[in-house]
Amino acid sequence: GPIPEVLKNYMDAQYYGEIGIGTPPQCFTVVFDTGSSNLWVPSIHCKLLDIACWIHHKYNSGKSSTYVKNGTTFAIHYGSGSLSGYLSSQDTVSVPCNSALSGVGGIKVERQTFGEATKQPGLTFIAAKFDGILGMAYPRISVNNVVPVFDNLMQQKLVDKDIFSFYLNRDPGAQPGGELMLGGIDSKYYKGSLDYHNVTRKAYWQIHMNQVAVGSSLTLCKGGCEAIVDTGTSLIVGQPEEVRELGKAIGAVPLIQGEYMIPCEKVPSLPDVTVTLGGKKYKLSSENYTLKVSQAGQTICLSGFMGMDIPPPGGPLWILGDVFIGRYYTVFDRDLNRVGLAEAA
């Protein structure tokens, strides 16, 4: 049957779960990221200057009986940080890490090629609560054409249905923080029925978006645009000029790097934002599209919409990140190449 993987939620901004690599399994926390296609974790061979490496779990190939050396070098670039190291090798990936302990039958994906990261520049990965990233997008965007974990999982016939589904809890204090269901759909996490939207380009989980309406006054993505559904992005990302207009409409103040803040007392009176996909309307209330961020006793309210340019050939694209997925339970269907959405329970 389907395998549930429990996720932890850190401040509504990072969702991650535990996997094992090697025999016996070495445990790592990873972001299950539908916006990329590679798996990487920090390496025991990381450079001394790599601070991110000091504070995270590290893979030691010498301790695994199923390790196969590969050694090709690689570099991966994300929206927020880049990473270089070497394409380590092949080994067995277990989800969850120790299935015997969790009482759920887990799965083991054999001969999975992944990256052992030896260099992680910048602050991006130091602040991360997770060790690595497990990409769940299509093979087309996999660096070095490595076969992604879910593709290997399908080929090894480890699930009955070639689908996986995400529930992301938007209450940072509540348990569980979320759930990734491999090979199925967990009906306890949504209400009503699922509506499906066809993938328009099999690279990211890309679908067609009809429009984004802010209250009754402003329409963005007029005449339609393309959007990707991305569990690895915290916010909803749009083109800078469109998000600037949206910011004006909701009284948001530009912060840095395309992010905006909103005076917390204004949040309850802000208009709904409605995303239309395939003729279905997906409403987000101001409570859904704002994030409360507390630091040093101060609470600020961050807009859930961020402006960022995604240039051709991939872009221009909107990104429907955790702000959206938290409100709408999401099914990623590799069998029929479609994305299913229903209101999260």
Curated annotation (Swiss-Prot):
Protein's UniProt keywords contain Metal-binding: no
Documented EC number(s): 3.4.23.5
Keywords noted in UniProt: Aspartyl protease, Disulfide bond, Glycoprotein, Hydrolase, Lysosome, Protease, Secreted, Zymogen
Propeptide: 99-103
Cysteine pairings via disulfide bonds: C46-C53, C221-C225, C264-C301
Any GO BP: proteolysis
Glycosylation, residue list: N70, N198
Pfam families: Asp
Active site: D33, D230
Location(s), subcellular: Lysosome; Melanosome; Secreted, Extracellular space
Record's catalysed reaction(s): Specificity similar to, but narrower than, that of pepsin A. Does not cleave the 4-Gln-|-His-5 bond in B chain of insulin
InterPro entries reported in the protein's UniProt record: Aspartic_peptidase_A1 (IPR001461), Aspartic_peptidase_AS (IPR001969), PEPTIDASE_A1 (IPR033121), Peptidase_aspartic_dom_sf (IPR021109)
Entry GO CC: extracellular space; lysosome; melanosome
One Gene Ontology MF term: aspartic-type endopeptidase activity
PTM characteristics: N- and O-glycosylated.
Chief localization: other
Residue ranges occupied by any Peptidase A1 domain in the UniProt entry: 15-342
Oligomer status and interactors: Consists of a light chain and a heavy chain. Interacts with ADAM30; this leads to activation of CTSD. Interacts with GRN; stabilizes CTSD; increases its proteolytic activity.
Family designation: Belongs to the peptidase A1 family.
Protein task: Acid protease active in intracellular protein breakdown. Plays a role in APP processing following cleavage and activation by ADAM30 which leads to APP degradation.
Protein name: Cathepsin D
Organismal lineage: Eukaryota, Metazoa, Chordata, Craniata, Vertebrata
Gene name of the encoded protein: CTSD
